[in-house]
């Protein structure tokens, strides 16, 4: 992918523009801009899922696919590997990045924790889109307890 600084700048501008266009939360308190960002990420994830794994299409298990996300996909997008992958062996995976590039530039402080979710929506869509292309239906959520670390929870939905 492109230079990390360009991607970070583009992402920051997308978030800022969508937030400026959608100042009030909709019904249920969820902003439509979060859905738009996740949709953008989903489409990018689909494209990357089609492009990246051609050499490694021997995924035998869900765990192999998640390892691919943590290593190959994360390196292609963020130029670093995911720090941790945990599972309960029942279809739930937790991916942890202790220095998530899209949150690194944010100041650490409790007031900024409220702003963090809007910077994670695109990446949730990215993960979900890549998994979708690889034939895995999933639900991806993100959480931040302390900046710049974040966790992505991937719940595999059995068909």
From Swiss-Prot:
GO process terms (BP): endoplasmic reticulum to Golgi vesicle-mediated transport
One cellular-component annotation, GO: endoplasmic reticulum
Compartment list: Golgi apparatus, cis-Golgi network; Endoplasmic reticulum
Keyword line: Endoplasmic reticulum, ER-Golgi transport, Golgi apparatus, Phosphoprotein, Transport
Subunit note: Part of the multisubunit transport protein particle (TRAPP) complex. Heterodimer with TRAPPC3. The heterodimer TRAPPC3-TRAPPC6A interacts with TRAPPC2L. Interacts with TRAPPC2L.
Residue positions where Phosphoserine is found in the record: 33
Stored SUPFAM superfamilies: Ligand-binding domain in the NO signalling and Golgi transport (SSF111126)
Function as written in the Swiss-Prot or TrEMBL entry: May play a role in vesicular transport during the biogenesis of melanosomes.
Name used for this protein in its record: Trafficking protein particle complex subunit 6A
Family stated for the protein in its record: Belongs to the TRAPP small subunits family. BET3 subfamily.
Gene: TRAPPC6A
Main localization category: Golgi
